[in-house]
């Protein structure tokens, strides 16, 4: 996995996703529909670059949704923000297959570190916030974890957060 495109992207035309790794799977299709609507609204408002951290759960679902919408939305770009090389090494087989397929289809892959380190996921979240004009979230209100950190950081920076929960 490597950065395939050396293009810098326009923050004003970028959205980042954040959400929980685990969610009520009976709501999967409802969540996917909400993601799809939010992505199309963002696209209709001029957003072209959609940044996913490619973690299991909402991140991969968001990446899948962007990928499925690209054919009908010219210029839509999927950017993978990977915290460290080998991120998917501990994923369950199904999630690993999904990750591998999506990485191959991503328009840009940005690997932030060659190796894992304790703060790498938070640094990835901060990278996404600092490179997005808006955050699309699936957040249940818990005041801990990466999703909470990402939303808090975005709000501190005055970045709009759309919560699909």
Predicted regions and their residues:
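Acidic/glycine-enriched connector segments
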Residues: 2-165
